[in-house]
């Protein structure tokens, strides 16, 4: 069982949040975590993973073009992504910087791929996914770990019911 954590990060802020998501995945026995920036991710990485957690900084209220180009470029494997788990995380420079719309743009792409999407757990806010503004990294680090763990636990549960 594998969870892919992929992201775009120009300054390192989103990468740092991706690493926290990875920490959460690693807490679940039997689930491997593959973490890659979106410019290094391959179609095989998508196909070989049971779940995809994607992250982006906010760019004009949406995901970065670099991450969107992955979804656009992988359109040919959409049918093979049906039923896989999807989740999202986002970062912004400012507190009211469009994080929720960015999360929704990522989740929307996952829905178009036929994926089953999930938000962050209730003990991490219970919204569309994990998001924070610059300077809030320490506050939301634990929420990213919780998201990664929640995704990995669902991978295990779904694997047990399909086997």
What are the language-model segments listed below?
Residues 1-28:
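N-terminal beta1-alpha1 ligand-phosphate binding loop
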Residues 6-8, 36, 89:
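Short hydrophobic segments within beta-strands
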Residues 12, 61, 101, 138, ...:
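A generic "alpha-helical surface" signal
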Residues 28-33, 115:
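A generic structural motif
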Residues 38-122:
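Helix-loop-strand module that forms the ligand-binding subsite of alpha/beta enzymes
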Residues 41-42, 116-163:
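Glycine-rich phosphate/pyrophosphate-binding loop and the adjoining helix
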